[in-house]
Amino acid sequence: MEKKEINDRIKSLLVEDLFLADSVDEISGGAELGTDLGMDSVGFVELATLVGEVFGIKVADTDIGDGHFTSVDRLTEFVAARLH
């Protein structure tokens, strides 16, 4: 899976499942999940679960705190690395 596809799917999760924006067009790759999108700790756990299910990868609780979930771009890099 290409990074663009991963990035687009993550943005879709943020809009369709977590309701953090009205449209994927409102979310830039550099958007900070906590600061810019207002995600709280429960949202981070929900996103980690969704990412694991959608991409078929293991996401540990420590991955959230290790900085992989700070922005859309960082999360895209994390998922891409786990897929390859």
Per-segment meaning from a language model:
Residues 43:
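Two-component histidine kinase catalytic core, primarily the HATPase_c
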